[in-house]
Amino acid sequence: LSKLPDYDYEGTGEYAWFTQNCYKYGFILRYPEGKESITAIQYEPWHFRYVGLPHAYYIMQNGLCLEEYIDLVRQHPYGSDPLTFTDENGKNYEVYFVASDDGNETTSIPVPAGIKYEISGNNADGFIVTVYKDEPVTAEPATEAPTEAETETVPEDTAQDVPAEQ
């Protein structure tokens, strides 16, 4: 077993830079000081979570914890006014919520055509869609399938049960 570091991370001193700049890399301080009544967890200066660049930026700029941010996004369901903002680099984002289809194995999530987007489950009741308004989707070059994957051999006695490839 490896030995654990023999120090406490308080997010101060030489570590203050990470705490102050983590949002630029998509991280947030998961349990910030002063949000204990909302998170139900005491302040943990060492506990960071990756949420993605746009979300980390918004959370940091608005002094929110993750629970507050998720509640805010729920107030912007698809079809209503999305949460829109511009980050410090001038990039524009649109964020909206899509509730999961209770009882179904799948949920249809409306997304924009031709613009980069990401979908993330909120681990509770739905999905957060992030639209990168300034980033059109570019067609990626097709990759060639390995030769062994180009054809499939089906036993003759089951061939009638297999739909023909189109």
Predicted ranges, named:
Residues 138-166:
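Ser/Thr/Gly/Pro-rich low-complexity, disordered linker/stalk segments of secreted
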Residues 1-86, 90-137:
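Cell-envelope/glycan interface and biosynthesis
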